[in-house]
Amino acid sequence: MAVGKNKRLSKGKKGIKKKVVDPFTRKDWYDIKAPSIFEKRNVGKTLVNRSSGLKNANDSLKGRIVEISLADLNNDEEQAFRKIKLRIDEVQGKNCLTNFHGMSFSSDKLRSLVRKWQTLIEAHVDVKTTDGYLLRLFAIGFTKRRPTQVRKTTYAQSSQIRQIRQKMFEIMTREASSCDLKELVQKFIPEAIGREIEKAARGIYPLQNVFVHKAKILKAPKFDMSKLLELHGESTDETGTRVVKDFKEPEILESV
């Protein structure tokens, strides 16, 4: 008789399974708060692992970037093609306070602007705001027919393209360097910079569909908690009052 393991007796031990733990039981939901320049403040929720040991949930949340449509931020469906990036800079309780981190157009909007028989003109420039943010702004514009034009093509000459691009540089630099980040974001939404470029280029070649279609933050100043709270419309008065106490000289002891 061959000596060996009886396979029939060991069959019952194979069916042991590990207990499955739902990973969501170890996570918490946090509310994302948009700056006060937007109409809607509660823009969504984000998920993070709970604080345990040396790992803090707040550290995992800080620096997280979320992308939200401007239609959701301002309750305006006409602005659905603009995407706003917000960066979580501070966590207070279950609220994540964010700041503007970038803006871009959706790809379908950009593709819808490009048409035949016209010239596309692009420009980008690095500019610093008054509060120390270094941004790169990207502008785009298209030529259009003059009022009395019969020809269907609206191609601009190379010299005209250079002049229009120079106007784009000057206007973007002037508009961005004369205001802080909050005021600059408020210029993006009604497309105030695009209208200025369109007006300035009228004497060179008429333009249409002029937009600042992208904005990137290249460098941010040192984090300031009071400025972030001011951006969210919260109280920043944390300075205490100095306590003045009359000094009394101790009496001299006759014996120790």
Swiss-Prot record:
Entry's Gene Ontology molecular function annotations: structural constituent of ribosome
Modified sites of kind N-acetylalanine: 2
Primary residence: cytoplasm
This protein's UniProt keywords: Acetylation, Cytoplasm, Ribonucleoprotein, Ribosomal protein
Cytoplasm keyword on record: yes
GO cellular component: cytosolic small ribosomal subunit
PROSITE patterns according to UniProt: RIBOSOMAL_S3AE (PS01191)
Leader peptide range in chain numbering: none
Pfam families cross-referenced by the UniProt entry: Ribosomal_S3Ae (PF01015)
GO biological process assignments: translation
InterPro entries listed in its UniProt record: Ribosomal_eS1, Ribosomal_eS1_CS, Ribosomal_eS1_euk
Superkingdom field: Eukaryota
Location within or outside the cell: Cytoplasm
Family (UniProt): Belongs to the eukaryotic ribosomal protein eS1 family.
Xref: HAMAP family: Ribosomal_eS1_euk
Assembly: Component of the small ribosomal subunit. Mature ribosomes consist of a small (40S) and a large (60S) subunit. The 40S subunit contains about 33 different proteins and 1 molecule of RNA (18S). The 60S subunit contains about 49 different proteins and 3 molecules of RNA (25S, 5.8S and 5S).
Protein name: Small ribosomal subunit protein eS1
This protein's encoding gene: RPS1
